[in-house]
Amino acid sequence: MTSRRDFLKKSGLAMAGLSLLNRSPLHSAIGAAAQTAGDLMSKRPPLDKRKFVSEAVDEEIRRVQGDIGNRDLAWIFGNCYPNTLDTTVQFAMIDGRPDTFVITGDIDAMWLRDSSAQVWPYLPLVTQDPKLKELIAGVINRQTKCILLDPYANAFNYGPTGSPFDKDLTTMKPGIHERKWEVDSLCYPIRLAHRYWKETGDTSPFDGKWRDAMKLVVKTFRQQQRKDGRGPYKFQRVTAVQTDTVAGGGYGNPIKPVGMIVSIFRPSDDSTIFPFLVPSNLFAVHVLKLLAEMSRDIMKDEKFAGDCSSLADEVYEAVQRFAVVNHETFGDMYAYEVDGYGDHSFMDDANAPSLLSLPYLDCVPESDQVYQNTRQFLFSGSNPYYFKGAAGDGIGSAHTGLGKIWPIAIMMRAFTSRNDNEISRCLSTLVESSAGTGFMHESFDENDPKKFTRSWFAWANTLFGELIIRLQKEKPYLLS
């Protein structure tokens, strides 16, 4: 059976570090030989080859680059920030409504998580660019269709074109690319919809179909609290990769129904060990509150708003009771996964939602002591997925194996830090990790950034752009 890892390898794009390096004019990280931004050839597609052109985004690139004193950093920012628009979006008007399909980059399919995160950094510009606003409205409309097709699926095709995972032992409908149940897949579209509404005041995407999709989200969350049995979802795959299939006959390892929501897979698309995935549950708490607000103000549905709020409260209380665990060194901290019986895992995974990313996603305050204790743990030898080598240090993922650091986790470290030295180290490592390609990657070897995975990973690229824009606003002196 084809796994996602095999799918990437067969596409010839998973490990393209050396070939890209040889084509790149950049062979250094921060502090190396001086080169002007003009010396470094843009890695963007030619104007007529770009999937979408936004004057507001291009102007933002010029504005921010003008404040970046480090030339390498300015060059990478100029390549990365527009990468989603340049290379991954397919816009159309369907039945008189905008529709935007967003691929991840090297995989020709749309993940609910990735697509939401990929366009998120452009939201501050939508009032300046009506076409950009329409594009993101199209993402919301497409996500609505996806959720209504199957709320348990994580990734979708543009149409009923078939999938390399058609033989998975689960209910694969036409149009589904992969059917891995991940709580965050239903959280990200709510986060995107709420921010779009707040930025624009536009409620046109939030029609009857969107409302049906949101009610299906809450229904699915309640099903996966498993108070009345295991629910309708199960998944197995014939594979040599343990994390691509599911224990317990496809239902996951046993849980005690304590109020949290089961997530059979992590945001990395790897199966969970203990099915209550803590960062995803806290993300669900946050977005359920956002959905309650939208229900009251847009849908005028107090009953559904109350349902969202009560579910958020129930999940939050369960997290505080069953997922805050005392560590002998770091004190009370969040476990990564729990089962309600007292079993837990102390670790983190690079993909967001992660424990590290909780303040970035507005799930917990940065000052929260339990979070701060957790954060200290994450960057210690006690975290089995914290790696440190000649090329830098950071959090990795079981998805890519030991010794592989993820740039997304380095960005989350910078987003959640107020320490200038820590942020500067993150920027240095990110530039180093680019390995002369001008782009971010999925992961890189702790000792050799030229050994990286996924040369075209749009979420990481656009997130890097978001980080630089935030620093330009809040700490511009770090970009010199």
Indicate residue ranges for each PLM-predicted region.
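Low-complexity, Ser/Thr/Pro/Gly-enriched N-terminal "stalk/linker" regions
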Residues: 35-113
